[in-house]
Amino acid sequence: MNIIMGILDQAVSAEEGYFAGGASRKSLMEEMRRIRSKYKATVFGDSGREGMKFKMALLFVLKRVKQKIILEDRLMEVIDSEVAYIIGCVKSITSEPIRVGTVEAVRPIQHEAEHKCAKPRTRANFPMDTSQLLRSWLKENMDNPYPSDAEKAYLCQKTGLGPAQINNWFINARRRILPFMKGKCSNFK
């Protein structure tokens, strides 16, 4: 039992050491390898109640470490992207010639610089399960693709979208998706 708790304690200590900033990712991996070899040598074959409890606790710790590392990687990607974007904005602003003028003349220049650095807005798609639910309703009601108010309320509740979003989705779907659905169904008949 003491060996089991020692291994679990080492895993938690390795996690804390890495995320507190005292250890590198490489040292975390080395420590996890040492823990794995110690685990295989002592506990791996233990399928008793205590062995199962330990395995579950170790799995919990390792999943938590994995999730934190994935989050850390995603954050680094976002930070790198933002740094590159800001560098681009700074280069864009500094590459323009300096204009000398009154305060009134400086304001349009500031607005122009802000406009050049403004991130383009990209439209976000609905989550896959939301689209899937709406598409399945459309497929079931292909002959009459106009949901009633009660059906719209049900779809709003299930998808979390507003009534206007549901209406717009069906307007677009009748133009873009429905012709292809009807074409596929007629091919199979």
Curated annotation (Swiss-Prot):
GO terms for cellular component: nucleus. Residues 119-181 bind DNA. It is found in: Nucleus. SMART domains: HOX. Pfam families: Homeobox_KN (PF05920). Gene3D superfamilies: Homeodomain-like. It comes from the Eukaryota. Keywords: DNA-binding, Homeobox, Nucleus. One of its GO terms (molecular function) is DNA binding. This is Homeobox protein HD-2. The keyword Membrane does not apply. Its main location: nucleus. One of its GO terms (biological process) is regulation of DNA-templated transcription. Belongs to the TALE/KNOX homeobox family.
